[in-house]
Curated annotation (Swiss-Prot):
Upper lineage: Eukaryota, Metazoa, Chordata, Craniata, Vertebrata
Superkingdom of the source species: Eukaryota
Keyword flag Lipoprotein: no
Identification of the protein by name: Protein orai-3
Lipid bilayer topology: Multi-pass membrane protein
Catalytic activity: Ca(2+)(in) = Ca(2+)(out)
GO-annotated cellular components: membrane; plasma membrane
Region named Disordered: 1-21
Residue(s) at site: Confers selective permeability to Ca(2+) ions: E81
Keyword Nucleotidyltransferase in annotation: no
Keywords (A to Z) from UniProt: Calcium, Calcium channel, Calcium transport, Cell membrane, Ion channel, Ion transport, Membrane, Phosphoprotein, Transmembrane, Transmembrane helix, Transport
Single GO biological process annotation from the record: store-operated calcium entry
Length: 290
């Protein structure tokens, strides 16, 4: 190959059959034109990316507002409508956990609902304008952290609290059913119990047969209906334990799905950015070679 053949090849038109100068282009002009087209496409893609972020923020705020309104309303109804048995001694930790979980659940979802209510009208107003340059008028870029915080509170933290709320409601509601009133007292001779003079005086007026009937009916109070006296727990405790045993695997599956989903989403975004960087590197190498 001679020395001038390379330059002549670069200056030769890509389409030699076209005789008009406007219809022919050298390789250098072709690469330059491709670079300009890519820069224009990048500007267009940046604008399209801004619109995509706007629509994504709007969708997240809408989803978080609907979810937060539903779950917070359920938590409030659960706290108001739950009926506590006065004659049952609840564990103090159970009532404290139920009250704290309900309060935190309502507070988290109300915060997400407040962010959605404040930001969503401004984003909706900009998205309804049919102008490509109007995307910069939306506050979703500047308040991106609040959008993500509301989305995380509503979908991640709020859902975990809701699962815990369901478990606690089951314990508060079902534990008193069939629960023993207390341990049966040991049998003590009546002669060794001086404080019960009133009951003895009342019992003296009864016939021996009626007194035997009343004494035979007293132990049944310590064992409510639908419960075996020998069992330590009633059917309510078994129902609450069943709901807990079901909800624990559901929570683990939820955590696994959330981690897998966000990991796949991050991997997809990383691959897309990697492909764009490789395209820019290839074009830069072609320009430097020319």
């Amino acid at each position: 190959m001679k020395g001038g053949e390379g330059d002549t090849g670069e200056q030769a038109p890509l389409n030699p059959e076209v005789d008009s100068p406007a219809g022919s282009a050298t390789y250098r002009e072709f690469v330059h034109r491709g670079y300009l087209d890519l820069m224009g496409a990048s500007q267009h893609s940046l604008r399209a990316l801004s619109w995509r972020r706007l629509y994504l923020s709007r969708a997240k705020l809408k989803a978080s507002s609907r979810t937060s309104a539903l779950l917070s309303g359920f938590a409030m109804v659960a706290m108001v409508e739950v009926q506590l048995e006065n004659d049952h001694e609840y564990p103090p930790g159970l009532l404290v956990a139920f009250s704290a979980c309900t309060t935190v659940l309502v507070a988290v979802h109300l915060f997400a609902l407040m962010v959605s209510t404040c930001l969503l009208p401004h984003i909706e107003a900009v998205s309804n304008i049919h102008n490509l340059n109007s995307v910069h008028q939306s506050p979703h870029q500047r308040l991106h952290r609040y959008v993500e915080l509301a989305w995380g509170f509503s979908t991640a933290l709020g859902t975990f609290l809701f699962l815990a709320e369901v478990v606690l409601v089951g314990w508060v509601k079902f534990v008193p059913i069939g629960a023993p009133m207390g341990k049966p007292a040991p049998v003590v001779p009546m002669s060794q119990v001086p404080p019960v003079t009133v009951s003895l005086s009342l019992a003296s007026n009864l016939t021996p047969s009626s007194a035997s009937i009343t004494t035979s009916q007293q132990p049944s109070k310590a064992c409510p209906p639908r419960q075996v006296c020998d069992s330590a727990h009633g059917p309510g405790w078994q129902a609450a334990m069943a709901s807990t045993a079901i909800m624990v695997p559901v929570g683990l599956v939820f955590m696994a799905f959330a981690l897998h989903f966000y990991r796949s989403l991050v991997a997809h975004k990383t691959d897309r950015h990697k492909q764009e960087l490789e395209e820019l590197s290839r074009l830069q190498g072609e320009l430097q070679a020319v």
